[in-house]
Regions:
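Periplasmic-binding protein-like
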Residues: 50, 54-96, 114-117
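Short helices/loops that flank or line small-molecule/ion binding pockets
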Residues: 17-20, 32-47, 51, 59
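Short loop->beta-strand "edge-of-pocket" segments that line small-molecule binding or catalytic clefts
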Residues: 1-8
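Extracytoplasmic/secreted envelope proteins and their assembly/folding machinery
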Residues: 12, 32-35, 39, 50-54, ...
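Short beta-strand-to-loop elements that line the ligand-binding cleft
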Residues: 5, 23-30
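Ligand-binding clefts/hinges and TM-proximal coupling segments of bilobed small-molecule sensing domains
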Residues: 10-25, 65-71, 95-117
Length: 117
């Protein structure tokens, strides 16, 4: 099997960590190119972010015959600031407000994401 991955991505690291041989890994410019490799038949599978996979595959997309398969890793993202920044408290207040009023959940629902605690 061959796996298309975005060069330098977490997906590439995941397949390397799984022990997939370098000869089976096709590194491409971006995640959209990884999907194109599968659609073109030049790769058996691709490893991309689940958000991208959900948005770009399945019914109503250019890749209607493709679907997300398995999850290899979990990635979480955060917001970072310089140590001691007064912006941290302001952003924390805003995030707490958005969580309480349902704004964050609405965004998560809109983009088929799971809201982290």
């Amino acid at each position: 099997l061959t796996f298309a991955v975005e060069n330098g991505s977490a997906g590439q690291s995941a397949v390397v960590d799984l022990g997939i041989a370098e000869s089976q890994i096709i590194a491409v410019q971006d995640q959209a190119a990884a999907l194109m490799e599968v659609a073109a038949g030049t790769s058996d599978a691709c490893v991309i972010d689940i958000t991208m996979a959900n948005a770009m595959t399945g019914e109503g997309t250019s890749y209607a015959d493709l679907a997300p398969g398995i999850s290899l890793t979990s990635e979480e993202y955060g917001i970072g600031f310089r140590k001691g920044s007064d912006v941290t408290a302001k952003v924390n207040e805003l995030m707490a407000k958005w969580k309480a009023d349902g704004t964050l959940q609405a965004l998560a629902d809109k983009y088929s994401l799971t809201l982290a605690e």
